[in-house]
Amino acid sequence: MTSQRVRDRLVERLRECGIQDERVLSTIRIVPRHLFIDEALALRAYEDTALPIGHGQTISQPWIVARMTEAVMQVAPKKILEIGTGSGYQSAILASLGLEVYTIERIGKLLRQARKRFRQLGIKIRSKHDDGSTGWTEHAPYNAILVTAAAPTLIDTLIEQLAIGGRLVAPVGTASEQALVQLTRTIDGSITHEILEPVTFVSLLPGMLD
């Protein structure tokens, strides 16, 4: 169930659910999601659903990946920071769109698996094993920042690493109630917020695990 027909069906579903950016849809059609999950779940790779990847983490639902990617692509970013590498799928989507991707993962085993997938696909992504809530100051500022786990509030440390004209997209809230929030730093340096969608993400946790 990794055929082009199955991928096309997923893309059509995403289009029906409101995803309009054809660059995003084309990239989701091309990037092999089945390589980012356990072989036992391969038959479900192109369903529009989140799937477990171990360590209490998930690979996000394709619609969420598309929605977040579409939101950051609206500001035409060149350099993006991702907080929470997970399986590496979202990173691969961003890199395949031609972005310079920096990604941070707190769980060492997940990051090692993701790096192996990046090498397998020939994708250049800079990655770091660290607490994502601190960002990656050495390469800041970023045109876009994408957070793939939910914190109770937007994290000031990450906002500070956002370039003028840049956009941060992140789930915000508690385990029982979350919303996808879009923050944009305007040309005059002020910050605008917009709530995009109700969502459900795993929690953004502090510290590091091997």
Swiss-Prot record:
A GO MF annotation of the entry reads: protein-L-isoaspartate (D-aspartate) O-methyltransferase activity
Give, as one word, the top-level EC class: transferase
Q: Which reaction does it catalyse?
A: [protein]-L-isoaspartate + S-adenosyl-L-methionine = [protein]-L-isoaspartate alpha-methyl ester + S-adenosyl-L-homocysteine
One GO term of the biological process aspect: protein repair
Residue ranges of coiled coil: none
Q: GO CC annotations? A: cytoplasm
**SUPFAM superfamilies xref list:** S-adenosyl-L-methionine-dependent methyltransferases (SSF53335)
Q: Which domain of life is it from?
A: Bacteria
Write the record's keywords in alphabetical order, separated by commas.
Cytoplasm, Methyltransferase, S-adenosyl-L-methionine, Transferase
**What residues sit in the active site?**
S60
Under the heading NCBIfam families, the entry gives:
pimt, PRK00312.1
Q: Which family does it belong to?
A: Belongs to the methyltransferase superfamily. L-isoaspartyl/D-aspartyl protein methyltransferase family.
Question: Function, please?
Answer: Catalyzes the methyl esterification of L-isoaspartyl residues in peptides and proteins that result from spontaneous decomposition of normal L-aspartyl and L-asparaginyl residues. It plays a role in the repair and/or degradation of damaged proteins.
Q: What is this protein called?
A: Protein-L-isoaspartate O-methyltransferase
**Could you read off the lineage of the organism from its UniProt record?**
Bacteria, Pseudomonadati, Pseudomonadota, Gammaproteobacteria, Lysobacterales
Gene responsible for this protein:
pcm
